[in-house]
From Swiss-Prot:
Modified residues (N6-carboxylysine): K98
NCBIfam families: pyrC_dimer
Protein name: Dihydroorotase
HAMAP family to which the protein is assigned, alphabetical: PyrC_classII (MF_00219)
Length: 345
């Protein structure tokens, strides 16, 4: 197959950041994706309806002329979140609330430290039809970074899912066989997103031959057996798994430093890279479900009606992109060849 046409996809997990960065990130995503779930981990985090409304306006103002791209907004759960916050956020158009364990990722220090205390909030979310998005890692310093996702499932996620059968839960950016198996065996109210980097790479691509800071993300890349499990699960075409890039921009100097930031900025190449993975797996017929159908179906939103066409044509991801402030950013897969290209995009 040398050409494939899909219903226009959505990105069910990304980071736009704020300020000048929006002039880069919003057009990059709006190029191909009709909607995106926007993460709330700004400084300060987006925790209530007023902050969401203001952030959404800043995103809309950064859309290219004529764009109909729609940001789908989220709020950041803290131990101070109340049922009224959920009600107000829902009224403001928020579709989901994000659970970050404190310290798990960029700008998550304000996040949840006592998970059980949030059970009344989860109850309110189920009642009011708001999804729970989960960064599924424990953060205790004595737990090995490669084991934190599996430990989170065992310690917390299994309990949340069992306690709230009416709550839709998205286990975001899963990285392990443990997570894939958990989602596959869970009830229909549980789904997961998978990033391009966790399908394309494993921890050798981060650490062999030198540290590769632009492949560093959280949750961290795992061993190849976990990568293969993720690839196998998308090849099944299961509706429990859908596209979420976790595209997460950081300026070049913040990645290439003594304490480099976590995140892969994949917006300019994500759909093409997913196509490459599905092609390699002999499962191109499953790409549209993953990219365009399973996400809106799970969220209870209409599928898009426009289409995007990809052709089998080689191109090279740019080595860097200059941000509006003049500083460079290195995109994911920089300088690498990609086998699929969007037609007329």
């Amino acid at each position: 197959m040398t050409q494939i046409t899909l219903l226009t996809p959505d990105d069910w997990h990304l980071h736009f950041r704020d300020g000048d960065m929006l002039q880069e990130t919003v057009p990059a995503t709006a190029r191909l994706f009709q909607r995106a779930i926007v993460m709330p981990n700004l400084l300060p985090p987006v925790t209530d309806a007023k902050m969401v409304t203001e952030y959404r306006e800043r995103i809309l103002a950064a859309r290219p002329a004529g764009s109909t791209f729609e940001p789908l907004m989220t709020i950041f759960l803290t131990n101070n979140t109340t049922e009224q916050d959920i009600i107000d956020a829902k009224a403001a158009g928020v579709v989901a609330a994000k659970l970050y364990p404190a310290g798990a990722t960029t700008n998550s220090d304000a996040a949840v430290k006592a998970l059980d205390a949030l059970f009344p909030v989860f109850e309110a979310m189920a009642k009011h039809g708001m999804l729970l998005l989960v960064h599924g890692e424990v953060t205790e310093s004595h737990i090995d970074i490669f084991d934190r996702e599996a430990m989170f499932i065992e310690r917390y996620l299994a309990r949340i899912v069992a306690a709230f059968p009416a709550l839709k839960v998205v286990f975001e950016h899963i990285t392990t066989k443990d997570a894939a198996d958990f989602v596959m065996s869970a009830p229909d109210n549980v789904a997961a997103t998978i990033t391009p980097q966790h399908l394309l790479l494993n921890r050798n691509d981060l650490l062999v031959g030198g540290v590769r800071p632009h492949n560093f993300c959280l949750p961290v890349l795992k061993r190849s057996t976990h990568q293969e499990a993720l690839r196998a699960v998308i090849a099944t075409g299961s509706s429990k798994f859908f596209l979420g890039t976790d595209s997460a921009p950081h300026e070049k100097h913040r990645k290439e430093s003594a304490c480099g930031c976590a995140g892969c900025y994949s917006a300019w190449s994500a759909l093409e890279l997913y196509a490459q993975v599905f092609d390699d797996l002999g499962a191109l017929d499953k790409l549209e479900g993953f990219a365009s159908l399973h996400g809106p179906d799970f969220y209870g939103l209409p599928r898009n009606t426009s289409t995007v066409t990809l052709v089998k044509e080689k191109w090279t991801v740019p080595s860097e992109i200059i941000l509006p402030n003049g500083n460079p950013i290195v995109p994911f897969f920089a300088g690498e060849e990609v086998n699929w290209k969007v037609k007329n995009a």
